[in-house]
Design a protein with these regions (language model features):
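Histidine-anchored nucleotide/phosphate-binding helix
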Residues: 14-28
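Short, glycine-rich nucleotide/cofactor-binding loops
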Residues: 5-15
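Short active-site oxyanion
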Residues: 3-5, 26-33, 106-108
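Active-site rim loops that border cofactor/substrate pockets in soluble metabolic enzymes
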Residues: 40, 45-66
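General beta-strand structural signal in soluble alpha/beta enzymes
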Residues: 7, 34-36, 56-58, 82, ...
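Mid-chain, well-packed structural core segment of small domains
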Residues: 62-102
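Ser/Thr/Gly-rich flexible loops in soluble cytosolic domains mediating phosphotransfer, phosphorylation
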Residues: 96-124
Length: 124
């Protein structure tokens, strides 16, 4: 099974994803992380991503969600971590549907908040 995770977040919850990454950096060292360029840029503003194995794909606004979805459909991803905005407000640049659907089709674990993301990387 591949050991690559897709990490993604709506703009309003990128800080929460960054905090979660920081709190789980040791666990994440065992994975390759696929993150869209624009999400990665937002995460890098507030967080040190240091020793993590990160591969970026094009930004969400440039079709990065589609690129990540294709990677999921090819069977190259072991899990999806996407933090959507809990208020239902969307930044307009990050969509979860193009990522969730291929993850469902490929029977991948999906995490939508810090608690489920921690469970996913711990193998629960």
């Amino acid at each position: 099974m591949p050991s690559t995770l897709v990490l993604n977040a709506d703009s309003s919850v990128c800080p929460a994803l960054g905090t979660w990454i920081g709190n789980n950096a040791e666990l994440l060292k065992g994975f390759s992380l696929l993150i869209a360029e624009d999400v990665l840029a937002e995460l890098s503003k507030r967080n040190t991503l240091g020793q993590l194995s990160i591969t970026s794909c094009r930004g969400i606004r440039s079709g990065g969600d589609i690129e990540m979805a294709a990677t999921i459909l090819k069977g190259e991803i072991s899990g999806l971590i996407h933090f959507p905005s809990p208020t239902g407000e969307r930044a307009g640049d990050v969509l979860s549907e193009p990522l969730v659907r291929p993850a469902l089709l490929n029977n991948l674990p999906i995490a939508l908040n810090p608690a489920s993301a921690s469970a996913l990387v711990r193998g629960i």
